[in-house]
């Protein structure tokens, strides 16, 4: 398949500019350079014209500003992350990284404008739709892209993510446990828009929402304090982990809206569908509970971080938060013994889909599906679990065998 790119000389401006863009290099333009020229051309068509006074004061047009940022500030931003591991010459330039992050921001624009996400890999189609003269929001869309890049400038990106996220349990329980890599910005620059195994995103929708939370925070640091963000990003992370079936492209606009509300207010906005309803209720209950129990924030975070709970603590209950260490020690034991010990107390099974589920000896997903059931249906399971946790300060296989034998 042979592709041809059409560049309007009129849009590109003077012939000397065209010469610089094409001939001085002695080689054809890359796809990224075509995209850049196309985008700048779109901006020139829609940008406000400068007055003579503005020109005399040295002010730049919007297209000039964006073009300069692409060439300098935004290139410097992406340069440390230019190697996406393709093993090609593309690893020495930031073209792919720029386009992938640009597409992330474009997806946000689609959602905010209530437009279905463009599933096309054609960046030129996306550029025309969002920044063409026929789009009444084109100027604001350009500003959204500009803010989306600018917010990362002069930021220690690794430290930002590392201050609130981790991939494993640490002695700082307030950090959210997430999948690798912790630096979601870099992951987006390398993987966003790529599809694997049919329609599965290489950069999952949950990571899209989590990255947007950081972008939103960086753009609103004047109203969201650092400590507030640390608590609120945990809420967002919990909601993402508890919303497997709600993380859909046609629901992304609602997920973004709820994320913004959480970051702005530290609570849940009710009245519309977004994340999983059970997890939304639980996160609101935690907010109210922490108002009266602020000293227990660390232990709550520790319980949320347990791999079998992943933010959903309703099977233990906020009123039983002091049993957190016992819960950890219980599930450090042989899970087959944990299952048998629970069954000696009662039937703790849950109806999951079409069958009744109990915990497996070696499959963590069975436990997770039980523990994430809605609060009402969990009552008996919770009663049995708390009864077991009350029988020992610390659990071992020997302790569980004694409980089973008794």
Task: Give the positions of each predicted feature.
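Flexible coil/loop and intrinsically disordered segments
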Residues: 1-406
